[in-house]
Amino acid sequence: MAIFSRMMRKILLLPLLSGLFGFGIQSGLQVEPAGRQLKEFYFSLDVEHLWIAGSHVNWETGAADKPEATAGNHTHCSAFVAAACKRLNIYILRPPDHGQLLLANAQYDWLASPAALEAGWKPVEGIYPTLYETAQRLANQGYVVVAICKNPDEKVPGHAALVLPENASREKLEDAGPALIMAGTHNHRMITLAAGFKSHLPGWPEHVVKFYCNDRKPF
């Protein structure tokens, strides 16, 4: 009888523990209803056809606007992040408060400031791989999560992206990090952290990307 009772306690604890850590025994992290709405919103921005590298763009719409421009044409990762956040009524450093040039580096610094805290941004805490699990879980719950790194050379762009709500296993997160949607040299509606930040990472697991979550759910 005692052995049966211990077995029953273990069986009852399994779903509780998997719920606490956000992972089902088989299914991994799942996208919740608010996360599905956020994912649909991100996809509606059509990042694969707007905010295209090599063209000067209207930062809010991503449409090319100055064909004769010779500056501000490189990539538009931080402008895409800023535009998405603005449409969700969430403030992150953006024009006209800072120009598009080197905006990701400036956003990286700003997100660690009291102004960012007042705007609802908080750092996602943790170490590899728990940090990736937490960032993906928050996005899956419908929170806006930014992945960002600053270039050691402040005259060279950093990189910024949004964590995309997506079902994920612990193994997948350990191997490649959270799912992202991003503009860059090539724009992607879905790409892993390892692939999307590849040119900025000295190795894997990496320790240069920071994650910030806004405390207001858009949906």
Residue ranges and their predicted role:
Residues 4, 21-23:
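Aromatic (phenylalanine/tyrosine) cluster motif
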